[in-house]
Amino acid sequence: MVPPIPPRPLRAHRSTPLSGRIRVPGDKSISHRALMLGGLAVGRTEIRGLLEGEDVIATAHAMEAMGARIDRQETADGAGVWTVDGVGVGGLAEPADVLDMGNAGTGARLLMGLLATHDLTAILTGDASLRGRPMKRVTDPLALFGASFVGRSGGRLPMAVRGTATPLPVSYRVPVPSAQVKSAVLLAGLNTPGETTVIEPVATRDHTERMLGHFGAALRLGRDDQGATTITLTGQPELRAAPVEVPADPSSAAFPLVAAVLVPESHVTLAGVGMNPQRIGLIDTLREMGADILIRDPRIEAGEPVADLEVRASALTGIEVPAARAPSMIDEYPILAVAAACARGTTRMHGLGELRVKESDRLSAVATGLAACGVDVTVDGDTLIVHGKGTVPKGGATVAVNLDHRIGMAFLVLGLVSAEAVTIDDGRAIDTSFPGFVTLMTGLGAPISLI
């Protein structure tokens, strides 16, 4: 029997000014999609800047198990260049073994979309956190194509997916804003004859649509009579291999960015950060609170907007964060709550119900951790209310992260500005999205260490 991997507790102490120019790892959302669409394209796709975290590697292994050939070459500076030789739309092979997606919720849900319209059977599983996350909101629309799913109660993994040999085109209105649900339906539509349409009342990140277009799929955007966005995909295209330059992940950039805002006299530049309009809610919110964030050299790379961010330490003021902003920053609320704890005045973050079904119940985890660190915080339904005093938080707590990478990184940032050190009980999950986080932060001057 393989012995369990021991926890890796990390501790952050109050920091002196942070400084430097860094590039955080590649965007996780785009990395998953690049591997999947490269695996369905005809020819060889070259990917630079791929996030080499555990979640994305799980997707790479899954695509290999279904016939794609994936290889990594290392450049002189140690960066990885990935190549994917695709099998063509409709060419996925039935995997010989269970597909273990680890902690990759995005990878698992998007993969279900691909599997749903291929004539094969596959079994998906994951780690304890992923096995506890609901999948029904993805499997319900995918069943409309003709696929069937057998999982644990509540539609949880492990789950057997039986793809249909005769998929039917679908028109699906997304009931709750979710880029993962939208993307799973569009990916299922790739191997479906005719037109598949997703109706989206509230806009969510559009990485899937951008990358489908980059690989040559025919997409049509419009509006219905209620003002909702309609995305129509023509099925069974021949996707063409295309080079992909993955921008730095704005959700990962959020942690050094907020640290630079909060640690006095800091000055940090983050290079090549993805600036997709549906991903910059945190930047907009921090600037409203008073953060000094300059957007330098805006540009387009592989269909995605990118820029460098120059960040200086700033005094923040509490604000109201509307529910409508949640889709553009759903992963950034834990670190925004840390910023709010250091601001002067009250910050109310509305519409956070989605946080309850992430890698952990993030809403409860954030509130519990902040309270343990001496912050005045309350939860009112789906609203998180943080009463900042404009002073240094007490800190001094050990925070249970429950295998949630973003909770872990958020509270390490809090430790950099707290009177007493903050400890997280286990930092292993950070590698799922941000390998090298501690090394990068210590390079800026942050006192974060293994204990």
Swiss-Prot record:
Phosphoenolpyruvate binds at residues 28, 105, 133, 180, 362, 406. It catalyses: 3-phosphoshikimate + phosphoenolpyruvate = 5-O-(1-carboxyvinyl)-3-phosphoshikimate + phosphate. Keywords: Amino-acid biosynthesis, Aromatic amino acid biosynthesis, Cytoplasm, Transferase. The keyword Ubl conjugation does not apply. Signal peptide: none annotated. 3-phosphoshikimate binds at residues 28-29, 33, 178, 180, 331, 358. Belongs to the EPSP synthase family. This is 3-phosphoshikimate 1-carboxyvinyltransferase. It comes from Rhodospirillum rubrum (strain ATCC 11170 / ATH 1.1.1 / DSM 467 / LMG 4362 / NCIMB 8255 / S1). The lineage of its organism: Bacteria, Pseudomonadati, Pseudomonadota, Alphaproteobacteria, Rhodospirillales. The gene is aroA.
